[in-house]
Regions:
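N-terminal beta1-alpha1 ligand-phosphate binding loop
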Residues: 1-34
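Hydrophobic/aromatic beta-strand patches that form the interior of the parallel beta-sheet core
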Residues: 4-6, 39-41, 63, 119-121
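Short, solvent-exposed amphipathic alpha-helices that sit
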Residues: 19-29, 141-157
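A short, structured loop/turn motif at beta-sheet edges
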Residues: 32, 113-115, 156-157
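Residue-level detector of anion-binding/catalytic polar loops
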Residues: 37, 62, 158
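Helix-loop-strand module that forms the ligand-binding subsite of alpha/beta enzymes
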Residues: 50-150
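Flexible, glycine-rich phosphate/dinucleotide-binding loops
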Residues: 12-13, 47, 127
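A short beta-strand-loop structural module common to alpha/beta enzyme folds
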Residues: 34-47
Length: 158
């Protein structure tokens, strides 16, 4: 399997991104040992937008390794998404999926990466109960509810 590893760890403030960098390196080591083809990007180290588009076209699955910052991905990961996906118009997606005949239907179905998979590997300074327990901070909705927009962006392109 062709796997794209995206390391969203960031050295900022009191966080140095070391845990995410370590998990990223371990994933690369394990996946390579298992016989997978791996390409990677350490987002904070910089990237070439066109090369990233080609990596998305190449991959069968992408693993996003990143910390939870203020209930979202770090701003550098958001910038990466905005730059790469916008430049990928025509290669990663052709439109938002709607048609002139009925513009109220089909939104989110214009992705060109059908059959590709994604996985989030997330680090938080929060116990799992903060996400899963009723009455706690995330009201028992779970981690995937916090990241629903992130899952949808991956679904949008594929």
């Amino acid at each position: 399997m062709n796997i794209l590893l995206l390391d969203g760890g960031k050295d900022f403030g009191h966080s140095h991104g070391e845990l995410n960098h370590t998990l990223h390196k371990k994933a690369k080591e394990v996946l390579t040992a298992l016989g997978h083809n791996v390409k990677e990007t350490v987002i904070d180290a910089g990237y070439d937008v066109e090369a990233e588009i080609e990596k998305f076209l190449w991959m069968d699955a992408v693993i996003w390794q990143m910390p939870g910052w203020w209930m979202h991905e770090p701003w550098t990961v958001k910038k990466y998404i905005d730059e790469v996906l916008t430049a990928g118009h025509g290669k990663l997606y052709h439109s938002d999926g709607r048609h002139r005949v009925n513009p109220t239907e089909g939104y989110g179905t214009g992705g060109l990466l059908q059959g590709k998979k994604h996985m989030l590997s997330l680090t938080w300074n929060a116990p799992i109960e903060a996400f899963t327990r009723e009455g706690d901070f995330f009201e028992g909705k779970g981690v995937d509810a916090v990241y629903m927009p992130f899952h949808k962006l991956n679904e949008f392109i594929g």
